[in-house]
Amino acid sequence: MSTPSQAEVRRMVAAAGTIVVKVGSSSLTQPSGHLDPDKLDALAAALAQIRLMGGRVVLVSSGAIAAGFGPLGFDERPADVATQQATAAVGQGLLMARYETAFGRFGIRVGQILITAEDTIRATQYRNVERTLDRLLDLGVVPIINENDSLASNEIRFGDNDRLSALVANLVRAEALVLLTDVDALYTAPPSQPGSRRVEYVPNVIDALGDIQVSGSGSKVGTGGMVTKLEAARVAAVSGIPTVLTCASNAGPAMMGDPVGTVFAPVKARGSSRRLWIGFAADPRGAIVVDAGAGQAIRGGRASLLATGALEVHGDFSAGDPVWIDAESGEHLARGLAGFDSEEIPQMLGRNTAQLKRFLGPQYAHPLIHRDNLVLV
């Protein structure tokens, strides 16, 4: 597809029938860590206007841990996982209660969906998420999505809601993604540095990633920084979805296509939602190293990974977990969902289908990774 102009991309955003908006913890809280009712109400009002004009709106909202640590007596976000998860369990209810009240003023119902990355890398759970979101939107509900911080493990998790929002945008076939943060736009360097310039338009986020100096986590109450937002914009771009990055106070103008923040152009036509989730939803748990012939077949697309072309297996994973497919050089060729547990694969290495069936049984005469569960990188 040809690269659209900035004005064209902003018109795409303004015309979006379905829009996904992500808001970070720091955009919803006071410096003390408590929820800021005024900020939350202002965001709800902006989203409600889009909904009342006939738009379909999905909100991906951080803030459960930030909402919970104040009421539990902590001065700042807890560092250990167990306390974070307990805090999220308290804070998620407080957060949703505020959203229900805020949207209720406009006669709009909200629905909570808590997701873990592990939920979404298996086909059945993935389809359940897709069906639930579609039905909520059909009913005029604003779905409010968050990673299930109370249950997600550090081993398999999104780690931030930026990436989750981009995946959700593809899942609901959104026409725009809006990332709301505590800065008004992307800058060429941290805004406090002399010479830093605001970037109004990014025609190709993939090419631009190496040209912009960004920092890590942006605040004491959130987990993401500008790096994760650029990654989200990249995921959206390769899904054919334009993205706007700006501060929460610009939510309304951003969704209306006004020249605020930074706008990122899509770089591809929309692809398969399922394959995008495999490619980006969760970090791989291990790797299967393949020989040159298998690598060439994988690169050609639409080829399953057969045991006959596999040389080594690394990591500890279960059937259905995401894994890398690596060349002998260590280059990542693809990501896919393993068809077998890591402990089963060594006995399968180098064997063809007939040998697997004869020596190990018919249950092993299947690909290590089926082509429908494989995505090139």
From Swiss-Prot:
Top-level taxon of origin: Bacteria
Domain PUA stretches: 285-363
Subcellular localization, as worded in the UniProt entry: Cytoplasm
Binding site residues for substrate: 62, 149, 161
EC number: 2.7.2.11
Pfam families: AA_kinase (PF00696), PUA (PF01472)
Disulfide bonds, paired cysteine numbers: none
Record field: catalytic activity: L-glutamate + ATP = L-glutamyl 5-phosphate + ADP
Enzyme class: transferase
PROSITE patterns found in the cross-reference section: GLUTAMATE_5_KINASE, PUA
Pathway the protein contributes to: Amino-acid biosynthesis; L-proline biosynthesis; L-glutamate 5-semialdehyde from L-glutamate: step 1/2
One BP term from GO: L-proline biosynthetic process
InterPro entries the record matches: AceGlu_kinase-like_sf, Asp/Glu/Uridylate_kinase, G5K_ProB, Glu/AcGlu_kinase, Glu_5kinase, Glu_5kinase/COase_Synthase, Glutamate_5-kinase_CS, PUA
Keyword list, A-Z: Amino-acid biosynthesis, ATP-binding, Cytoplasm, Kinase, Nucleotide-binding, Proline biosynthesis, Transferase
Membrane-spanning parts: none
GO annotation, cellular component aspect: cytosol
Entry's Gene Ontology molecular function annotations: ATP binding; glutamate 5-kinase activity; RNA binding
Residue sites binding ATP per the record: 22, 181-182, 223-229
Family: Belongs to the glutamate 5-kinase family.
Function: Catalyzes the transfer of a phosphate group to glutamate to form L-glutamate 5-phosphate.
UniProt-recorded name of the protein: Glutamate 5-kinase
Organism annotation: Bifidobacterium longum subsp. infantis (strain ATCC 15697 / DSM 20088 / JCM 1222 / NCTC 11817 / S12)
